[in-house]
Amino acid sequence: MNNDQPLLKAQSPAGLAEEYIVRSIWNNHFPPGSDLPAERELAEKIGVTRTTLREVLQRLARDGWLNIQHGKPTKVNNIWETSGLNILEVLVRLDSTKLPSFISNILSARTNISAIYIQKAFKVEPQKSLEAFKDLDTLADTAEAYTNFDYDLFRKLAFASDNPVYGLILNSLKGLYTRVGLFYFANPSARELAKRFYLSLKTLCQTQQVNDVKECIRQYGKDSGVIWANMQAYLPANFNE
C-alpha cells in the first residue's frame, strides 16, 4: 500500500480498506468520475482479501462515495452531489486544514435551519416547546452540561416543530456536535452568552412572540460565531481524530 498520505487510525482490515479508499478519493488520487482499479489489484495494494474489499465497496456506495456498476468498473462519485450528512464525521477527520471553516459552515447552517423550525415549534406546540427548557434553571456551569443541554434543546424543538426531518438532521450531527460543544463551552463567555440566549428564547415561547424568534436565533448565531472565531486558533491538534 503506497498512498503517500497517512491513513486514519484503522482498527481492522475492513477499516483499513475503507480509510485508504476514502482518503484516496479526498486527496484526488481517485478523482470524481474516475474508475477504481480492479478488485484484485486494489485488494493486493491495500493488503486485504477481495471479500473484505467487496464489503467495503458496497458500504461506501451506500454512503455515496462510489457507484458500483455490475459488469463495469466501480466509478468514483462527486460526494458533494451524492452523499449525505452521514459522512460529515469522516470529512472532519480527513482535512485538518479546512476544519475551522468546515465547522463554521456547519454552525451557520444550524443557525439558519433552527431559525425556521424553532419558530414553527413555538407556534404549533408551545407547551411541548416550553418543556424543552425544563432543566435550564438547574443547568450546571460546565462544558459537558451545556453541550448536552444545547443539543437536547435544539433536538426537542426540532421534533416539536411537527417536521421530524429536522430532528433526523440533528441526530446525524450528534458526534460532531458533541466534540465542538465540549471545546466551545469550555469558554465561560460562551456559556454566559448561551444562558442569556436560552432565557430569551424561553421568554419568546412563553409570551408567544414567535415573530421575534428568527432574529433572536440569528443574533445568537452572530455573537457565538465571534467567540468561535476567536477560539479556532486554540483547537487542539487531535480535535479531528
Curated annotation (Swiss-Prot):
Entries under Gene3D superfamilies matching the protein: GntR ligand-binding domain-like, Winged helix-like DNA-binding domain superfamily/Winged helix DNA-binding domain
Keywords of this entry: Activator, Cytoplasm, DNA-binding, Fatty acid metabolism, Lipid metabolism, Repressor, Transcription, Transcription regulation
* One of the protein's GO biological processes: regulation of fatty acid metabolic process
In the UniProt record, does the keyword Glycoprotein occur? no
Molecular function (GO) terms for this protein are: DNA binding; DNA-binding transcription factor activity; fatty-acyl-CoA binding
Record SUPFAM superfamilies: GntR ligand-binding domain-like, Winged helix' DNA-binding domain
Record CDD domains: WHTH_GntR
Annotated InterPro entries: FA-response_TF_FadR (IPR014178), FadR_C (IPR028374), TF_FadR/GntR_C (IPR008920), Tscrpt_reg_HTH_GntR (IPR000524), WH-like_DNA-bd_sf (IPR036388), WH_DNA-bd_sf (IPR036390)
What residues are annotated to bind DNA?
39-58
Q: Please verify whether the record's keywords include Nucleotide-binding.
A: no
Q: Which GO terms describe its cellular component?
A: cytoplasm
- Could you tell me where this protein is found in the cell? Cytoplasm
Specify the HTH gntR-type domain's residue ranges.
Answer: 11-79
Q: Any idea what job this protein has? A: Multifunctional regulator of fatty acid metabolism.
HAMAP family the record matches = HTH_FadR
Quaternary assembly: Homodimer.
Name of the protein:
Fatty acid metabolism regulator protein
